[in-house]
Amino acid sequence: MFIGDASILKPIQWCATEHPELPADIADWLMELGSMTRRFEQHCQRVHVEPQRECFITRDALGEEAEHLPVSQRYWLREIVLFGDNVPWLLGRTVIPEETLSGPDRALVDLGTLPLGRYLFSGDALTRDYIHVGRQDNLWARRSLLRLSGNPLLLTEVFLPASPLYTHCDSIPK
């Protein structure tokens, strides 16, 4: 697990969903409304997650993410690397206001190596407010404001070069 203040995610340049440089095959992945974990499972034998950082942080540590979440005394931060057949496919960062962590959803702080999608999409209490698309150098990224039983959480995903998102497109990152 990572100790310290640095995120595993480098800065991301966010753009409009209708960005003219967004190829249709990339948009199909980035605008996925279902579980990205399930989608990845269609392209490998085994998906697993390795947590890099799990801790409570203050609003000051959110940076521009604070614009997307309500004011809270603390936020649960989870940063992970998701692997498909032991190859890193995705960096994930989840920020959850403490108020979202009530009742059974308190389990979000104890996911460990369980992919977030397996928890979120196991019931019918999940909705998505929006998906923002962005770039981190040559890599595609997306950010979603999700609501679990009406309570918000912010999920940012960066698709690494070996990700199947790039398999059938002309913009494979170097």
Curated annotation (Swiss-Prot):
Pathway: Cofactor biosynthesis; ubiquinone biosynthesis. InterPro entries: Chorismate--pyruvate_lyase, Chorismate_lyase_/UTRA_dom_sf. One of its GO terms (cellular component) is cytosol. Keywords: Cytoplasm, Lyase, Pyruvate, Ubiquinone biosynthesis. Substrate binds at residues 36, 78, 116, 157. It holds the Pfam family Chor_lyase. Its main location: cytoplasm. The keyword Transmembrane does not apply. Its EC number is 4.1.3.40. One of its GO terms (biological process) is pyruvate biosynthetic process. GO terms for molecular function: chorismate lyase activity. It catalyses: chorismate = 4-hydroxybenzoate + pyruvate. It is an enzyme of class 4 (lyase). It is found in: Cytoplasm. Removes the pyruvyl group from chorismate, with concomitant aromatization of the ring, to provide 4-hydroxybenzoate (4HB) for the ubiquinone pathway. PANTHER family: CHORISMATE PYRUVATE-LYASE. Monomer. Belongs to the UbiC family. This is Chorismate pyruvate-lyase. It comes from Yersinia pestis.
